[in-house]
Amino acid sequence: LSLGGHMHTMFAGARKFKLFYRLSFKRMVIRFEDNGSAALDFVCSKDELYKILSDDDSIEIPESQIPILPSNMRYFSKNEIEEFHKKDESVTKPIVILLHGLSGSSSEAYVRCISKILFERYGFDCAVLNSRGCGLTQLTTPKLFCALWTHDLRHIADSIKNAYPNRPIYAMGFSLGGDILANYIGQEAENCELTAAAIVGSPWDLCGSS
């Protein structure tokens, strides 16, 4: 039974489908040049989520962010952050950056569904970019995001490519996240760091879709 796009949107917003596509995440909070903050949630195994840290390591709770996350998520540790940013040309495992829709986050069912398949079935690393103010990310500036705001995605893609120059980077954007991704690709043109991208359910005429 089809009740139209508005009803579909309301139903998907009301139902989070928490019993399906269960995943664990490690969160890295990114601080940009303008002091804005966004969060990258990396899909991880349960063993990785609950692993015992060494004596010289500790969980890094970023300044201005909430100290307690949902039970299926934790912050990166100090050593994990250092390791992630360390340049390593030997890493060739593909990574997918996922961009959620308006007011979404890594907790959305559509994000968890595709992330679970890519991570568990195909062996991709998956990182969900929670936009400023989304997914329990605390705002550190008055600036939010919109379909034309590609700065944060560009920063993430460039950072990954600089650390892992031989690693294929893919991206998938849903709804508003797809618009951000499409604009980023258009702006970067031949300089785009992405190997491939997919845009799902995005409005092409934002004014007409309002």
Name each region found by the language model.
Residues 162-210:
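Alpha/beta-hydrolase-fold enzymes
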Residues 40, 96-99, 114, 126-129, ...:
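Structural signal for hydrophobic/aromatic residues that build the beta-strand cores
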Residues 102-105, 140-151, 171:
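Alpha-helix capping and helix-loop boundary segments enriched in small/acidic/polar residues
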Residues 45-139, 159-162:
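Short, surface-exposed "cap/lid" segments of acyl-processing enzymes
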Residues 33, 41-45, 99-102, 129-132, ...:
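Structured beta-strand/turn binding interfaces of compact recognition modules in eukaryotic regulators
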Residues 1-37, 44-57:
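N-terminal targeting or regulatory segments adjacent to alpha/beta-hydrolase or S9 domains
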Residues 26, 34-38, 92-95, 122-127, ...:
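Core residues of folded domains in eukaryotic genome-function proteins
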Residues 142-164, 183:
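Alpha/beta-hydrolase active-site loop
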